[in-house]
């Protein structure tokens, strides 16, 4: 439930490339617009609401974080196995989702010098994943595979948090060299004539949450807080860049309205893998460009909902148990 804090046993401690804490922003209002005071100036302040900004978790893509971000942003999660664990994740549908248009919620603990003289020690309750972005780049190292998740929260919090954080977990991270399957709309970019032509990719998910203020939504410190995050018109976007060569079929697929599956897989080892299977992809835009002096095409995919298989299926194997369960 949105107002239920996580227990310490379910808290996962991890690193974040975003060094800023998640800010709390209480909003006050005044009586400036009211007449009858004898002047135009404000005379009183009133508590209004917590206007909590979105917060970005930015990380090198690991099996653990990908499983977490996909699970909490899409909502329909099935876990199987016993170390490693396999998560099969698809977008929840309002007609069958037990919580309607709401996704699973989590708590966020942030601490600076915890203990008797803590600078910051609080737990934000009722957080949700607004969206994520997966970026694959033509570069070496961990930065070649990045994932960020944009999170929102209601304004409810507990301070001090009452949480003793566990030891930091060791992530099992991917890089672009670990891509083991890369076929978009019938074009295999790992083997055959299109091998070695793939440059980069960005995939993103956006839940477009509706405002969560309503009668009875709740209050903290006398300020109104949000009481739900319901998804709006969700958006799934994929863009990728490939080198142009003689006989490239991307333009033909665009003009002929050709659709097909798209499979993207990263494999670190038997215990850590990530697969994004788009059930029906077409090409919306194919734009000529230049990448490091090489002629390239930037392809904007359009992901279509298939009546049998849905839109996208994420299959993730990771040692981390109990995500979104």
Identify the role of each PLM range.
Residues 1-325:
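Signature of extracytoplasmic/envelope-associated structural regions
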């Amino acid at each position: 439930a949105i107002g239920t804090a996580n227990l310490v046993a379910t808290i996962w401690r991890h690193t974040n490339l975003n060094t800023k804490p998640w800010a709390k922003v209480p909003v006050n209002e005044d009586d400036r617009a009211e007449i009858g005071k004898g002047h135009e100036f404000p005379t009183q302040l009133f508590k209004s609401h917590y206007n909590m900004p979105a917060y970005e978790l930015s990380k090198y893509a690991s099996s653990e974080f990908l499983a977490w971000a996909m699970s909490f942003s899409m909502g329909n999660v099935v876990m199987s196995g016993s170390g490693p664990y396999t998560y099969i994740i698809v977008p929840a549908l309002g007609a069958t989702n037990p919580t309607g248009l709401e996704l699973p919620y989590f708590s966020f603990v942030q601490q600076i010098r915890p203990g008797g003289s803590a600078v910051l020690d609080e737990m934000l309750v009722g957080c949700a994943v607004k969206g994520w972005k997966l970026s694959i780049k033509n570069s070496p190292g961990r930065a070649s595979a990045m994932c960020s998740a944009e999170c929102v929260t209601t304004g409810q919090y507990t301070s001090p948090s009452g949480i003793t954080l566990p030891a930091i977990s060791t992530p099992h991270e991917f890089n672009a060299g670990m891509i083991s399957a890369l076929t978009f709309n019938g074009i295999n970019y790992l083997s055959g004539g299109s091998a070695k032509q793939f440059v980069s990719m960005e995939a993103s998910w956006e839940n477009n949450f509706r405002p969560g203020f309503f009668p009875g939504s709740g209050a903290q410190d006398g300020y109104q807080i949000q009481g739900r995050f319901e998804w709006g018109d969700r958006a799934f976007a994929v863009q990728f860049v490939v080198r142009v060569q003689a006989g490239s079929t991307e333009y033909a697929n665009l003009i002929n309205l050709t659709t097909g599956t798209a499979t993207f897989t990263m494999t670190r080892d038997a215990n850590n893998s990530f697969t994004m299977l788009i059930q029906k992809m077409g090409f919306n835009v194919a734009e000529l460009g230049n990448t490091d002096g090489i002629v390239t095409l930037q392809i904007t995919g359009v992901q279509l909902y298939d009546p049998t298989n849905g839109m996208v299926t994420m299959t993730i194997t990771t040692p981390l148990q109990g995500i979104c369960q």
